[in-house]
């Protein structure tokens, strides 16, 4: 029950959510700064409160051609959500042109024993959330949304890209 005053030019919060200052009611700044502010050439045109994309990864296994491991169609599934994730499904030309085909996309997370970690940032299962500034109920709702996005992406891989033989490991 002691008050401690710390004078620092910069503090790095390395907790899971980076929410120590928010929880303590201390003024803070977070997110991506526009390159006009940071001076960095990273392509961030507009500042935002996004700190890091969140991904609920999935581990899929290749059960072999001829096997059908397709999951039930998730609620809210729309393949256009993942349009542009790879060259195999690129319809909306207003989106950035993908640089990889589905095989390379899946090989990004290839593991031993015919398993694949599904963790794809570009029109995949990454989701941008600011969990720091959410209350616990909103966080839980947002995390459910992230899990559902991964399920939809798995279904997209199976149904739209033809990897029906890839199922949960």
Language model regions located:
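Flavin (FAD/FMN)-binding glycine-rich loop and adjacent Rossmann-like elements that form
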Residues: 2-169
């Amino acid at each position: 029950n002691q008050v401690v005053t710390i004078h620092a030019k910069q503090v790095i919060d390395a907790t899971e959510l980076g929410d120590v200052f928010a929880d303590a009611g201390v003024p803070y700044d977070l997110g991506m700064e526009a390159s006009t502010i940071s001076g960095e050439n990273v392509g961030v045109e507009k500042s935002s409160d996004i700190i890091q994309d969140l991904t609920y990864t999935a581990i899929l296994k290749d059960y072999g051609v001829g096997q059908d491991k397709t999951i039930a169609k998730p609620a809210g599934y729309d393949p256009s959500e993942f349009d542009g994730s790879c060259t195999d499904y690129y319809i909306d030309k207003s989106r950035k042109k993908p640089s990889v085909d589905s095989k390379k996309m899946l090989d990004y997370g290839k593991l031993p024993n015919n398993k694949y970690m599904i963790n794809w940032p570009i029109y995949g299962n990454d989701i941008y959330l600011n969990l720091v500034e959410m209350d616990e109920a909103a966080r839980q709702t947002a995390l459910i949304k992230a899990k559902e996005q991964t399920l939809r992406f798995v279904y997209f891989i199976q149904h739209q890209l033809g990897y029906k033989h890839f199922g949960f490991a």
